[in-house]
Each structure stands twice: as structure tokens, then as C-alpha cells.
Amino acid sequence: MTESDTKITLIGSRLAREGLEFIFKGEMPECKKCRLKNTCLNLEPGRRYRVERIRNKDIHECFLHDSGVVAVDVSKAPILTTLESRKAVDGAKIMYEPPKCGKRECEIYEICHPEGLSRGDKCKIVEVLENLDSKCEANYSLKKVKLSW
């Protein structure tokens, strides 16, 4: 991981631990009056990130986090999802398209439509994991994959 792959942001001190993954929700009303908001809000809302390193233990006051916030390096976290089996090739670069399926009761619906990934995102297949054909209620030929975005 290079420094250009990471961003500096602030996170609640109770949450700050290496390896923590989170979905950045964006600006809250309390953020409007904060002098540090530009550092906190430099991530893309709705995306999944991972804390790579805690920069230091200095705690900054925050209107949202009662225990304050600390500076951390974060990177874009890989996302588990499904792809058509014929497109699931290690190292391939793809434009993400979720399966055309409305079967919300399906046991793999959440992984087929993961939070933090959007239709049209340019991604790389980091790893092809398992065949999910038998679990798909729409009878699609699917594989579980790990994507970087």
C-alpha cells in the first residue's frame, strides 16, 4: 500500500483501531460548525473504507463523538460481492453491475447488492472465492468475488 492509496481523516477515538472497516455516511448537521470538518469529510459518502494506521494519539474535540476524534490513514476497503461466473476472472478489470434481481428474500441478496459499491464502478477482481449457483433463487450462475474499487 502506498501513501497515495490512503487518505488522512478523523474517526471517533473509540472506533480507531487498525483494520476497522466502515461505511462513510457523510456530513451530519453537527459537522457544519466544526473547524475540522474538511479533514473529516474528505471521504466519499456511501463507500467502504479500512483504517490502515492511527497517525497519533492526539484527541480532537468533536460535536458528534463524545470521546473525541483521532487522525487515521484510511484506504478503500475491498468489497465482497457476486459476479456472473463467466466474468469472474482473477485480476480482471470490470465495470460493476449487480445482478438484475429483485428477490430480496434470497439468502445471498445482500452480498449481490453490497453497501459501498455502485453500478458502473470501475473495479478489479482481487480474488474469486466460491461458486454460489446453488444459493441463487433467480438461478443465475454466480461466483463470490472480492473487488477493489
UniProtKB/Swiss-Prot annotation:
The organism's place on the tree of life at top rank: Archaea
A Pfam family per the record: UPF0179
Cysteine disulfide links: none
Database matches in HAMAP family: UPF0179
Similarity comment: Belongs to the UPF0179 family.
Protein name: UPF0179 protein Mbar_A0292
Organism taxonomic ancestry: Archaea, Methanobacteriati, Methanobacteriota, Stenosarchaea group, Methanomicrobia
